[in-house]
Amino acid sequence: MQIILLEKVANLGVLGDVVKVKDGYARNYLIPQGKAKRATQSNMAQFEALRAELERAHAEKLAEAQAIATKLEGLMVQISRKAGMDGRLFGSVSNIDIVDALETQGFKVERSAVRMPEGPIKQVGDSQVDVALHSDIVVPITVSVLGEQQ
């Protein structure tokens, strides 16, 4: 299926690109998420009319993400959990816990923006976690897990 991208999509293209993707990917993900439209003649004409507005909105989102990124740069988030004598946690620290900790510090971040390549944190100590504020902006933060002894 031929689609017009309405925003940058990883491994696919940028705003305004006409690309061919599998029907299911377009129908079930890109179109419902508002990231693309079918590449028909009427949609192409409509897109060209709205192109400047879409580019302006994209630039605003990017500027907002950069402003948040400068505040998040070098930030350390502390989370305390019950832990055993060996430093292993009873449970784990997930992206939901990190989002909650960021919200208490005044940052509004979506759960899907917190990227944990090694999975949930299960040890006491410091860990690096990436926060993807925009498709172009990824900020590393430090999560310090403090163990509460029983």
From Swiss-Prot:
Pfam families per the record?
Answer: Ribosomal_L9_C, Ribosomal_L9_N
Q: Which UniProt keywords apply?
A: Ribonucleoprotein, Ribosomal protein, RNA-binding, rRNA-binding
The answer on whether this UniProt entry bears the keyword tRNA-binding reads: no
Keyword Phosphoprotein tagged: no
Transmembrane segment boundaries: none
Give GO terms for biological process.
translation
Check the record and name the InterPro entries matching this protein.
Ribosomal_bL9 (IPR000244), Ribosomal_bL9/RNase_H1_N (IPR009027), Ribosomal_bL9_bac/chp (IPR020594), Ribosomal_bL9_C (IPR020069), Ribosomal_bL9_C_sf (IPR036791), Ribosomal_bL9_N (IPR020070), Ribosomal_bL9_N_sf (IPR036935)
Coiled-coil segments on the chain, per record: none
GO MF annotations for this entry?
rRNA binding; structural constituent of ribosome
- Gene Ontology terms, cellular component aspect? ribonucleoprotein complex; ribosome
Q: Out of the domains of life, which is the source? A: Bacteria
UniProt lists the family membership as follows: Belongs to the bacterial ribosomal protein bL9 family.
Task performed by this protein: Binds to the 23S rRNA.
Question: What name does the UniProt record give this protein?
Answer: Large ribosomal subunit protein bL9
Record the organism.
Aromatoleum aromaticum (strain DSM 19018 / LMG 30748 / EbN1)
